[in-house]
A protein has these predicted regions:
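C-terminal motif of bacterial Sec signal peptides marking the signal peptidase cleavage site
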Residues: 17-21
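Alpha-helical segments in soluble extracytoplasmic regions
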Residues: 44-121, 125, 139, 143-160
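Bacterial signal peptide processing site
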Residues: 23-26
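Bacterial N-terminal signal peptides that target proteins for export
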Residues: 1-10
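Post-signal peptide N-terminal segment of mature Sec-exported envelope proteins
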Residues: 30-51
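Short, low-complexity, Pro/Ser/Thr/Gly-rich segments in the mature regions of secreted, periplasmic
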Residues: 171-195
Length: 195
């Protein structure tokens, strides 16, 4: 069960890669917009990567109580990161592309919805009883299933932003580059709680 959860969470790395993907006056405006987003996004990308690494490293050989604690913290961290990413997109203003306002609104709404879903998963994990191994395993399976749904939302949230001129502009920004994950030995403590 834990390996399924870890596999599902690693799919969340797609969001990190999605943020990694973003000529003329339009190109300059797109680059400026992408810089605003990516400068604010970098700490959130790192927070997500650390949270995902904590889940994966704990799931491999952790005790139920350790898995519960790591998953709970990771889901809270990812929810906070998604909220901050939504704020970064909102604060950057309207992207300088056709339907920019709708694009921004959709991305912000989807990121905020994803954050809410991660908090719901956190609650599910918190409610599991790690002393009853069978119920705990069954509960983790439900969490893994929910995680798959959320990851599809995560991917959709930024897929449109990473296309076209915006996608090219975001790809050039250091702040939107793939985060480096902490080593498995550092575990859940690698992700600071402060945003």
């Amino acid at each position: 069960m834990n390996k399924k959860l870890a596999a599902a969470v690693s799919g969340g790395a797609v969001l990190v890669l999605a943020l990694s993907g973003c000529g003329d006056d339009g190109e300059e405006k797109a680059n400026a917009w992408a810089k605003k987003v990516c400068d604010q996004a970098q700490p959130q990308i790192q927070k997500r990567a650390n949270a995902q690494q904590a889940i994966i490293s704990t799931a491999a050989d952790g005790k139920p109580a350790d898995i519960q604690a790591a998953d709970s913290k990771a889901f809270a961290d990812i929810a906070a990161a998604d909220k901050a990413l939504a704020k970064a997109v909102r604060d950057a203003g309207v992207p300088p592309v056709d339907n920019g306002e709708k694009l921004r609104t959709d991305a912000v709404n989807e990121l905020e919805a994803t954050a809410t879903e991660y908090l719901a998963l956190k609650k599910k994990v918190d409610d599991l009883n790690p002393k009853d191994q069978q119920k705990f395993a069954d509960g983790l399976q439900e969490v893994a299933d929910g995680l798959k749904k959320i990851e599809r939302m995560d991917q959709a949230a930024l897929a449109k932003l990473q296309s076209g001129e915006l996608g090219k502009a975001m790809a050039k920004q250091p702040g939107c580059q793939k985060a480096k994950t902490s080593s498995p030995a550092s575990g859940a403590s690698a992700s600071p709680s402060k945003a």
